[in-house]
């Protein structure tokens, strides 16, 4: 006998940037309980599902989510009452139907996702299973290689480089626990290196440092120095990953790199990345080009797609229609997975499966405005995604995910595999 949804209650809570977001509690007919809170992004893709905000300037500068909360507590609550909690696909289809818009503008992706995830958590509790096992009851699981965002620029930090995120990936680790240790040691090493340069060591939205560096290359150089000072070998133990968030640099058909006084065409931007990949131990570039620069993406993939993971975030917005086009046109070789870009768990899982079936990687990701919710850690393990991007090893809303992964690895024991370089399916 499968438990049914008895009640759902949503509320407005705060995210890690001090902005309101939606949290939902679900209780099933057998008393099982599930809770989920949704994150929110700073640099958002224009094709993302709609995050419903109140727009009432007298509360939270217009960012309140009373409308989304009310949607959960009224129309969604009555629609899902008595619904079989284990039928996730059916539940998500019902939410999509109830919303009835192509981009979830009526109910809000934040209202829908809070519901979708809270029901999944409750259904897992009903079966006395951790969420990752409920989503995929397997004999063996792959723990993700973490992407640690240790140096911030762009929209995540107000006084730094053109590019948004400079990350390290401990590809040479033997376990997730060791990867976390390596990433954390490099993070502390970077702090010392920056202090030695009389640089600011305050942290950005995702826990990375936000120094004032003269050029974008200086950011990479300072990280390479930090890796070595921590006792690791760049390009063997630890690789660099980038998220320049290039849509933020694009205007009128050109890419503007303000710190370098450069304005580049699409083909020149591709050559710029090719030069960086030649020079530095870079294993992954996310959103290296504007979200609608399809020709540029195809050119970049033709040139370096066999040696670097090219991840689409704003480019695909976890949307299978855009992803399907990307696969057909060979426009990248990886997708970033953000639950709140699409708004339901089932659609998120469908995007991961579509990427994997094409031989692409799927990187499960947080947002810059996070909560203490750890669903993405379980999702990464359940889907054997092999990679997770959830900030620096600093700030509790980031470390909550890493700590959840430590517990999962411990719980799985010999059934947990850390993939290292095997996580990058398409690299020669």
From Swiss-Prot:
Pathway: Carbohydrate degradation; glycolysis; pyruvate from D-glyceraldehyde 3-phosphate: step 4/5. GO terms for cellular component: cell surface; extracellular region; phosphopyruvate hydratase complex. InterPro entries: Enolase, Enolase-like_C_sf, Enolase-like_N, Enolase_C, Enolase_CS, Enolase_N. Gene3D superfamilies: Enolase-like C-terminal domain, Enolase-like, N-terminal domain. The keyword Metal-binding applies. Its main location: cytoplasm. One of its GO terms (molecular function) is phosphopyruvate hydratase activity. NCBIfam families: eno. Belongs to the enolase family. This is Enolase.
